[in-house]
């Protein structure tokens, strides 16, 4: 049985073919298909070819049907290996999952980031997320006093 295919086009103009049913894991794409906003080519201008290709790889692996059986343990192992990427790629995948409204990929990426910062000090977290500290030493001390339990 032949399945309907659609094309996704990245910000650089590279196109990727994917089964429509698989692409529907991304609610943004599903809504575009249902609203007939596409002529079988969907522009995904907010992401590079590299990131779009990773999203498609994830969707293909997570598409469940009789032809693609995968145990939960195998999928969990695959997910862990899939997320073994540098920080900027993980952030880009998180943004892509959010934009495309792919809840399972967003959860996986978010959990990966959470695991990366687990146990970090506030200073380490600011460095990790490239956030400037705009608190005075007095404000920091007040926060530490008010939330003493969190710093023990």
From Swiss-Prot:
Kindly indicate whether the keyword Nucleus belongs to this entry: yes
Superkingdom in the source lineage: Eukaryota
Where is the major localization of this protein?
nucleus
Where is this protein found?
Nucleus
Q: Which InterPro entries match?
A: SKP1, SKP1-like, SKP1-like_dim_sf, SKP1/BTB/POZ_sf, Skp1_comp_dimer, Skp1_comp_POZ
Which tissues and organs express this gene's product?
Restricted to siliques.
Q: Which Pfam families match?
A: Skp1, Skp1_POZ
Protein's pathway: Protein modification; protein ubiquitination
Spans annotated as Interaction with the F-box domain of F-box proteins:
94-152
Q: Name one GO biological process term.
A: jasmonic acid mediated signaling pathway
| GO cellular component, as recorded | nucleus; SCF ubiquitin ligase complex
Keyword annotations: Nucleus, Ubl conjugation pathway
Asked whether the UniProt record includes Phosphoprotein among its keywords, one would answer no
Return the similarity comment.
Belongs to the SKP1 family.
What does the subunit comment say? Part of a SCF (SKP1-cullin-F-box) protein ligase complex.
The job of this chain, per UniProt, is described as: Involved in ubiquitination and subsequent proteasomal degradation of target proteins. Together with CUL1, RBX1 and a F-box protein, it forms a SCF E3 ubiquitin ligase complex. The functional specificity of this complex depends on the type of F-box protein. In the SCF complex, it serves as an adapter that links the F-box protein to CUL1.
Q: What is this protein called?
A: SKP1-like protein 8
Gene name, Swiss-Prot/TrEMBL: ASK8
């Amino acid at each position: 049985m032949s399945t309907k295919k659609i094309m996704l086009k990245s910000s650089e103009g590279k196109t990727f073919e994917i089964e429509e049913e698989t692409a529907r894991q991304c609610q943004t794409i599903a809504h575009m298909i249902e609203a007939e906003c596409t002529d079988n080519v969907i522009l995904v201008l907010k992401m590079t070819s590299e990131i779009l290709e990773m999203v498609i790889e994830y969707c293909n692996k997570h598409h469940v049907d009789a032809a693609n059986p995968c145990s939960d343990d195998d999928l969990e192992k695959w997910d862990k290996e899939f997320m073994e990427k540098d920080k900027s790629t993980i952030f880009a995948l998180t943004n892509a999952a959010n934009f495309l409204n792919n809840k399972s990929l967003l959860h996986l990426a978010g959990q990966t980031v959470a695991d990366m910062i687990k146990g970090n000090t506030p200073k380490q977290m600011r460095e990790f997320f490239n956030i400037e500290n705009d608190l005075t030493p007095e404000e920091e001390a007040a926060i530490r006093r008010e939330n003493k339990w969190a710093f023990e």
